[in-house]
C-alpha cells in the first residue's frame, strides 16, 4: 500500500480541514485506512487481506514528511539485524526531529531525539550495528551473535565506507568488528 499524509495534498490549494474531511470520508468508504492522526494508508489488498507496510517503512515515511532522519535502536535494531528473534512490543528509533510517541495502527513507536553523530554513518549496517551492540552491551555478546555479525559484515557491499564507520563507534565495538574483518581476509 501507499502511505499518505494530509500535507501530500497541500498543492491542491485546499484548506487542511477540508482535506482532512475528504480523507476521513474516503476512510469511511473503505478506500483508506487511518494509521494515525493525519497518516493514512491506501491499502493493497491480496486474497489474504490488506498488506500493511512495515513499521520501518511507516517511520521512514513520517521522517521524510518531517524532513528528519531516523535510526532504529535498541531491540528494534537487534531484530532488524537478526541478532534477536524477539519482536519488539514498542519500536524505538533515534530521530533528528522531535521526540514523540506514535501509535501506527496497533503498533507503538517511540522517536527519541538524538545527537548528529548517530546519523553520520555512511552505511546502514554501521549505524544499525552500533545501536544493536550498544543495546546488548560489551559483556553480553554471545558466540551466536558474533557469527551473525560476521555474516552481516561479510555481506556488506560498501566495505570501505563501513570501515570508515568504525571510527564513529566506541573502542570496544571497533575491536570486535576489526577482529571480524581480520577473519574475512580483507
Regions picked out by a protein language model, each given a short descriptive name:
Residues 35-38, 66-104:
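Short gly/ser-rich loop at a beta-strand->alpha-helix junction or flexible surface loop bordering the NTP-binding
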Residues 114-186:
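Hydrophobic alpha-helical interaction segments
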Residues 1-62:
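Short beta-edge/loop segments at beta->alpha junctions of small alpha/beta modules
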Residues 51, 62-69, 73, 121:
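Alpha-helix N-cap/loop-to-helix boundary motif
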Residues 19, 73-74, 125:
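Amphipathic alpha-helical interface surfaces
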Residues 1, 56-65, 85-99, 125-130, ...:
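A short, terminal or domain-edge coil/loop segment
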Residues 103-113:
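A short, charged helix-loop
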Amino acid at each position: 500500500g501507499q502511505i499518505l499524509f494530509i500535507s501530500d495534498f497541500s498543492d491542491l490549494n485546499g484548506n487542511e480541514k477540508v482535506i482532512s474531511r475528504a480523507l476521513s470520508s474516503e476512510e469511511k468508504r473503505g478506500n483508506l485506512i487511518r494509521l494515525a492522526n493525519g497518516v493514512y494508508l491506501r491499502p493493497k489488498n491480496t486474497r489474504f487481506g490488506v498488506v500493511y507496510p512495515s513499521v520501518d517503512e511507516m517511520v521512514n515515511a513520517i521522517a521524510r514528511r518531517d524532513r528528519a532522519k531516523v535510526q532504529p535502536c535498541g531491540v528494534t535494531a537487534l531484530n532488524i539485524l537478526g541478532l534477536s528473534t524477539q519482536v519488539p512490543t514498542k519500536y524505538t528509533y533515534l530521530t533528528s526531529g522531535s521526540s514523540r510517541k506514535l501509535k501506527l495502527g496497533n503498533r507503538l513507536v517511540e522517536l527519541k531525539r538524538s545527537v548528529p553523530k548517530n546519523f553520520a554513518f555512511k552505511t546502514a549496517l554501521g549505524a544499525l550495528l552500533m545501536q544493536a551492540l550498544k543495546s546488548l552491551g560489551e559483556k553480553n555478546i554471545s558466540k551466536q551473535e558474533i557469527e551473525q555479525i560476521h555474516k552481516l559484515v561479510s555481506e556488506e557491499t560498501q566495505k570501505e565506507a563501513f570501515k570508515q564507520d568504525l571510527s564513529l563507534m566506541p573502542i570496544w565495538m571497533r575491536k570486535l568488528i576489526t577482529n571480524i574483518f581480520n577473519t574475512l581476509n580483507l
